[in-house]
């Protein structure tokens, strides 16, 4: 391992010990904000510190085995050869692990996310599939103990959604779901199809990270056009009595957000503003990424949200993830929320791409 990497790991080990000592300090314990921040930092350091300690132990084992090679006893030398082989293999494995752990973290990965699902080409069938994707993400959220909240929805005439926006809250939400942005294509026989022909429909998914109030970009109220209207969603007779639904237009960007899920106009406005902030932030993030990565685009986390990323073929029970040429014949499991079968390989490919970029920079 490079000396510069070793020095970086030693610095993290030292910082880990400092944080551990601070967490036992009475003045820190009494300051809840600082205690939470340090607890989070300690948790983030845990894996890399454990990996480096294991690396140091494997290096010590290798050095010890090398000393044993000087022994006169042939049996001891043979044992030393075996121990050297095992220690070298372990060092190689740990070095790969540590390289991944040292990759720069996306600061947004721990944030909550807004998942926007919109029916595209395919009419009623596209809306029905948008509903299927909503259910798939809901099941995945449930498996990860995340919370979901519908921000707004426009139901399809024959089921599903023309559009639905959900907020997903929990640990590491955006870091996993960000890979879902893009075009999702479905191939299946619609229930209304009497000839048994396979139809192709499309749904677009956009995943945006939530912008915490402390980090929120400044939105000038003068740049907003706010309209109220009567909700068309569920809610009984109440929805016909008050203009509780909100439509906010951000004039400089043309971004429009509607929220009508809550009975209170105040709550709908607050939800609409949080979605608007996320969308404006996404535009700003994309501008920044484009400037930084004009010469190299990430294979997996492409900013092109219209790009077709996945195909769900129901007659064959097949899911094809086009970004990494992954094909799985377990469509039912995926639709029931087993998304890790796709997301983990995507994350690994993204890490490999980052490592390759890092090697290019160092080379």
Swiss-Prot record:
Keywords: Cytoplasm, Methylation, Protein biosynthesis. GO terms for cellular component: cytoplasm. Residues 284-305 are annotated as: Disordered. The modification N5-methylglutamine is found at residue 237. It comes from the Bacteria. The keyword DNA-binding does not apply. Signal peptide: none annotated. It is found in: Cytoplasm. GO terms for molecular function: translation release factor activity, codon specific. Methylated by PrmC. Methylation increases the termination efficiency of RF1. SMART domains: PCRF (SM00937). Residues 284-296 have a biased composition (Basic and acidic residues). Belongs to the prokaryotic/mitochondrial release factor family. Peptide chain release factor 1 directs the termination of translation in response to the peptide chain termination codons UAG and UAA. This is Peptide chain release factor 1. It comes from Shewanella baltica (strain OS185).
């Amino acid at each position: 391992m490079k000396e510069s990497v070793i020095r970086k790991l030693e610095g993290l080990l030292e910082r880990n010990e400092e944080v551990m000592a601070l967490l036992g300090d009475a003045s820190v314990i009494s300051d809840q904000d600082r205690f939470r921040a340090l607890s989070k930092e300690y948790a983030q350091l845990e894996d890399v510190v454990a990996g480096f300690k294991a690396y140091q132990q494997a290096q010590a084992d290798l050095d010890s085995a090398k000393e044993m090679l000087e022994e006169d006893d042939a049996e001891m030398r043979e044992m030393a050869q075996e121990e050297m082989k095992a220690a070298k293999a372990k060092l190689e494995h740990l070095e790969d692990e540590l390289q991944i752990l040292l990759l720069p973290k996306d600061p947004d990965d721990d944030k909550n996310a807004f998942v926007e699902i919109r029916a595209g080409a395919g009419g009623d069938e596209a809306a029905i599939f948008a509903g299927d994707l909503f259910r798939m993400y809901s099941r995945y959220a449930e498996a990860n103990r995340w919370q979901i909240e519908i921000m707004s929805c426009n139901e399809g005439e024959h089921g599903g959604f023309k559009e639905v926006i959900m907020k997903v809250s929990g640990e590491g939400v955006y870091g996993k779901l960000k890979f879902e942005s893009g075009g999702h294509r479905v191939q299946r026989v619609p229930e209304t199809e009497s000839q048994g022909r396979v139809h192709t429909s499309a749904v677009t998914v956009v995943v945006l990270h939530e912008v915490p109030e402390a980090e929120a970009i400044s939105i000038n109220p003068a740049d907003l056009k706010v309209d109220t209207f009567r909700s068309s969603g569920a809610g009984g007779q109440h929805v016909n009595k008050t203009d509780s639904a909100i439509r906010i237009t951000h004039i400089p960007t043309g971004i429009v957000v509607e929220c009508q899920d809550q009975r209170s106009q105040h709550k709908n406005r607050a939800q609409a503003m949080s979605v608007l902030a996320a969308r404006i932030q996404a535009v700003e993030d994309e501008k920044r990424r484009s400037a930084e990565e004009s010469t190299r685009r990430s294979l997996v986390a492409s900013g092109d949200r219209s790009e077709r990323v996945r195909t769900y073929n129901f007659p064959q029970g097949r899911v094809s993830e086009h970004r990494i040429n992954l094909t799985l014949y377990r469509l039912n499991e995926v639709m029931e929320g087993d998304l890790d079968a796709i997301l983990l390989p995507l994350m690994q490919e993204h890490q490999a791409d980052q490592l390759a970029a890092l090697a290019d920079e160092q080379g």
